[in-house]
Every structure is written in C-alpha cells, then in structure tokens.
C-alpha cells in the first residue's frame, strides 16, 4: 500500500518539472503576454501542486493594471477590496464574498507571470482558508516561502 504523503510529494515534483520545462521553452522570450487559457491552466497546476487543490477556481481577468502586476480582490457589497486592505472583521457573516484575480497584460518574462500568479494565489488562500483579517504580507504569507522554493518559485513581497 502506498502512503498518501508520497502523492503530495509527487504533485510537487511534477509541478517543479513542469515549471522547469516551460521556463526553458520561454527562456529567451522577452515580454510575455498571458492569455486567460494560460492563466487558468497554470492556476490549476499550481493549485494542485502547492495548495492540494484547496483553492476555489475564481474568475481571472487580464487587464492593464496601474502600479501592479497582479491583484487578488475580494468583492463584497461591491466594495472590491484588494489584498492588504481586506479586513474580514468588517464583513458581515451572512454576505457571500466573491473573489477574483487580476493579472497585468504584459510581464517582462514568463517566470514573472508564474511568480505573480502564485503570489496572488497565496493571498487567495489567506482570504478563503486562513481567514486572515488583512490577507497581506505577514507571517501567514511568508510561511509559503519554503514550499515555493522547493517548487522552484519565488515568493517576494512585490
């Protein structure tokens, strides 16, 4: 009988190999423009590899963002609260919260796109699972740094 923990390790190894293979394909490409299909594909891959498929599939929008590469937004009562300003203590418990991720139209490299998407997925995890009142760059956020490093991803504040 196989252990269940090996399955999780295999997903992480598969994620790392898939990221490395795709990174070599886009190695010399400057100015990566993601499509919604690519964004959803990599969301599913990272969700399965790092988050054990815990994150809900949320809408993703690719648009021009001012001063940001990406945002994880909690929309409750049409207030569209971005991460960092998200305070769950102010949200009434009977209101459903709609989450979505916004990504910039163009990234310097493919790796920047993947790192940004994974970064926003950590904020989504903070909002949906940890119920972190602020969901910003705190100890809950940086607790993912080792898992990201093992998968070959970078987790930084910006």
Which ranges hold each PLM region?
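Active-site-proximal or metal-binding-adjacent scaffold patches in catalytic folds
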Residues: 1-115, 124-158
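Extended, alpha-helix-rich binding/interface surfaces that flank or overlap catalytic cores
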Residues: 121
């Amino acid at each position: 009988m196989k252990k269940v923990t090996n399955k999780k390790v295999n997903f992480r190894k598969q994620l790392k190999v898939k990221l490395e293979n795709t990174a070599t394909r886009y190695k010399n490409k400057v100015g990566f423009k993601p499509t919604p299909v690519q964004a959803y594909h990599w969301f599913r891959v990272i969700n399965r590899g790092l988050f054990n498929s815990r994150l809900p599939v949320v809408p993703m929008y690719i648009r021009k963002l001012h001063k940001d590469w990406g945002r994880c937004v909690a929309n409750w009562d049409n207030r569209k609260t971005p991460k960092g300003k998200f305070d769950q203590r102010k949200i009434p418990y009977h209101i459903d919260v709609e989450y979505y991720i916004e990504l910039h139209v163009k990234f310097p490299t493919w790796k920047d796109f993947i790192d940004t998407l994974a970064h926003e997925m950590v904020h989504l995890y903070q909002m949906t699972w940890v119920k972190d009142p602020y969901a910003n760059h705190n100890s809950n956020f940086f607790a993912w740094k080792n898992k990201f490093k093992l998968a070959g991803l970078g987790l930084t504040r910006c």
